[in-house]
Amino acid sequence: MAIRYVFGRAGRGKSYFVLEEIKKRLEGEGHHKLFLLVPEQFTLQAERDLIGKQALKGIMRAEVLSFTRLTHYVFNEVGGITKIPINEIGKNMILRKIADESSKDLSIYKSIAKQEGFITKLNDLICEMKQHDITPIELTMEFNEMEEDTLLKRKLNDIILLYQKFNNYLRDRYVDNEDNVNLLIENIEKVQFLEGAEVWIDGFQSFTPQIFRVIEKLAEKVKNLTITFTMELKSKESDQDLFHINRKTYLKIKSIAQRLGLEEEIIDLDRNERPVLPKVQEICHIEKELYAYPYQQYTGEITHLDVFSGSNLYTEMENVAAQIIHLVRDKGYRWKDIALVSAGLEEYSMILKRVFEEYSIPYFMDEKRSIMNNPIVELILSSIGILARGYQYEDVFRFLKTGFGDLNKDEVEELENYVLQYGIKGKDYAVPFTKGFTNKKHEEIEQEESDEIHEEKIKYNEFRERFIAPFLKFEKKIYRKKKVGHITKALFEFMKDLNIEAKLDQWIEELREKKYFEYVNENTQIWNKVMEILDQLTEILAEESTTLKEYGRILEAGFLACEVGVIPTTIDQVLVGSIERSKSHDIKALFVIGVNDGILPSSREDGGILLDHERESLDKKGLSIGNTLENALLEEQFTIYSALSKPTEYLWISYALADQEGKAQRQSILIDRIKKLFRNLNIQSDVVPTLNRQLHLITTPISTFKYMTESIRQNIDDKPMEDIWWDVYQWYSNESQWDERRNLMVKGLFHENQISYIGEQKARSLYEHPIKSSVSRLERFANCPFSHFVTYGLRPKERKEYQLSNPDIGRLFHDSMENFTKELVNEQIQWKDLTREQSDYFVEKVIDEMVPEFEHGIMLSTHRYQYLVTRLKRISKRAMWTLTEHIKKGQFVPMGHEIIFGLEGDIPPIVIELESGEKIYLEGRIDRVDILNDEDGNYVKIIDYKSGSKEFSLSDVYYGFQIQLLVYLDAVLSSQSQKYQAEVHPGGIFYFKIDDPMVKTTEKAVKEVEKEINKRLKMKGLVLKDVNIIKKIDEDIGRSSSILPASLTKEGEISKTSSALPEEDFKALLKHVRGLVKEIGEEMLKGNVKIEPFKKGGDTSCKYCAYISICQFDHSFHENQYKTIKELKNEEVLEKIRKENENI
């Protein structure tokens, strides 16, 4: 028995040496077995290399194995497995069950144990402990020796509990991979197939203590054992850190060999010149000097190394793709000669796929893919969630949107709209839908029901029945059955009822037809993977009792542990992979992307269950778990060294200056190191696009089209453009298949994103006749004509959701005010006679009556909304009593509430005649009108209730943004003048905020607090500049009013700070507003649909506009500019309006 050590730096041909030896043995006379042991993820490539490189006729005696596969070989011969094997999926599910059951006994991990990812970390830690031969007993002994109540001690307490329970659960029944290795160690000496065998171990940097024991047993059993080490036999002082882990591994193996008394042989490939693949000087220099201190600098010409700096991730990938095309097209490379690796592949993945497809580069992404986002997994977890959480919206539509239910995509979207609008959830699915199909008393609409409503009702209930039918069967099967086995069986039958397997096959066929072979490969495995998980779940937890919620968490833990590997669909393609994981065949060119600070080398996060310093603390006490931060950094350093030394002819290293969100990124220290190693290195970049760089991007028709478009756009914007792009444009012009796309491009380049007018004919066809307009419609047009066009011309409908919006709350306030007034009329109570107790009683009464019917009972649907009802009552009580006190303090009396003016209203509309003779009828609803009839004349006061803050601005009135109160005043003045056959005068126009403000107090008297509240509820607006009228609105005015925005001087005159206007200015304002309405009406009927929002200071009309995604207003377009509004002072407004009247 002998052991051989094969030494050599990266690229010295160690693997080639091993394969060559195996070839010689196969060609020789012997009949003994030959085994090549490699890491699990490299077995496929090693098999290919063994078959392909050696040109052998047969390899029956030689096999490529991982240590896991070796375990299976041993057990197949000697037996020994009397327990049920469980994989990582099964372990995760068991640990989830244990963690949930142990929640009360945990201290540090009580809440953390419920988080996604904890179980995976716990499983990893237990695996490490088993691999390092650390048992719960050893941990307990260490725990007992700890004196201080440290965080580590409390962590160990939880870990010991979970670890022990896990082992107890497995004992006598199950065996995991780590226990299998222990069984392997016990059984190696019994097997016959290893008698006289030769074993080569290649591709490892280090081993766990468990695997060291396996190697020890192999060394005792086999004829020859050969192990390769990527390191120099006598490393230079400068390379000590680089080969530190490899050297430790070698010394450990050597000590085993010496203890066994094996014959040792050293093969040093660094000294023995061998016919390995020659490499270019630049790659050789990197291999020798990357981590050498001191280092030698390369001073020659650099032709086989490029370092590139991209503006962002996308341009970095575009330049990578262009260079790959260059190598294949101009240098004669095959796709398979090229590999691309990254330490941040997740961030690049989607960009890479898109760019490579644009450039028609065939590629294979070597990665394990989580199945968590697969539709079948989504279907299973959402189905369990539906029953566990009682048909909640998220679970129901997570299920339906998988596409494997009995509703098609359009039906799902229709049902979702209905469910969101009426708040369908829980038990609502168990009975026929009636919301939206009943009258206000929730009685079925029968004979009066329209055919359309009846059909809608039938349709939605058919959707409901098709969705819920399989769930009712599922629910019935698990009713009162709590065992995991019963639920799993019912789940399988549920999937069978849905015909999932056949639907999956059909979907895979559709993917195949669309040539999405990558997804075909992935989804072909998914059904078997799911069945494997359900089988494992039944095998290990069948008799365990659980709840549906816990069952879902256990199943999710299993799915989280499951990944699928994808097999390459063809050999000739670019290999894409993680720098840590990928093991490629011999390659000529390597692209290393994402070489940014924190990515390569990575900024290792101490995110495990045990932190690095805690591992070190245990290591000092003899409990070595191995995976310290220092080891991880050394391993990564070795990985970088191995990767950069891999190609034979060309190396590309690149990084991005900004991430996908545009945040700046720094280059890696690795870039600085490469720059130091190569004196003449010139880092290329696309930040300033040179002619050569642009020429480099002219590759394939699809990818080049985009660059051409960007360049011509620059030319249009008066920026410099290289003439080569006109030649490129000419090429596309000569290719007829590009005509449609080229024409669209030209149209897009000269797109102005502006349509001023659609014409009178179209405008008249869009808007109803006669034109009846609300004030808010006119204000919207003044804000932006395009917003008006979309709202009142196109009339899109927003998806209605079962939730209260601010307008809904405002409507509730308004309705309650109206109903309050009706109660007073019914009870024949005058406002001036109303008491506080009566006011509060009527508020309670009207709101209690309104709430059950308001928006389909939404106010009673949740505790949050029920609390809102209480708050609304409090605010309404305060508002009603404040308004009552206002009336009591003055001589104005309410003439009416919710007064409608319009063609069919309580009072006539305002009629505006346009130049064409056509008329616009202004209509609206006035919250409250008060009137004063005395010897001085008739005066009216307009009050509009607002649930939010609303400041009155004469400047906004002037521009047409706030004409509501003046239009209301105009309508009432006109109607009352006709009624009294005499002039009626404006008394005031006001906003009243419905609120119950909180007042900070330091034991103030109740009267003082009330006074402060009334001050805050003071109305805002304009009052007639007449002391007599002001006093008739507020008889208690004194120096300052608590009702309206007015105050008096010592002499009893109206102060300058008062918001008051003489009657002639009121009339001038009314005239100005009528002029605005006419102007807006003229523009509306001309078809003005300009995208022209206003900008006033820092405020714009786009701020709360729902249509910004439709108009796509962008002020970088010359035609998209804000209509800048200057804020005018009150006197400026009045001066302008007076001048208007003078000019008429």
Swiss-Prot record:
Q: Work out whether the entry's keyword set contains Iron-sulfur.
A: yes
Cofactor binding: number and manner: Binds 1 [4Fe-4S] cluster.
**Presence of keyword Oxidoreductase:** no
Tell me which Pfam families the record gives.
ADDB_N (PF21445), PDDEXK_1 (PF12705)
Q: Which residues form the UvrD-like helicase C-terminal domain?
A: 274-584
Quaternary structure and partners:
Heterodimer of AddA and AddB.
Q: What else is known?
A: Despite having conserved helicase domains, this subunit does not have helicase activity.
- What is this protein's name? ATP-dependent helicase/deoxyribonuclease subunit B
Biological classification of the source: Bacteria, Bacillati, Bacillota, Clostridia, Peptostreptococcales
Name of encoding gene: addB
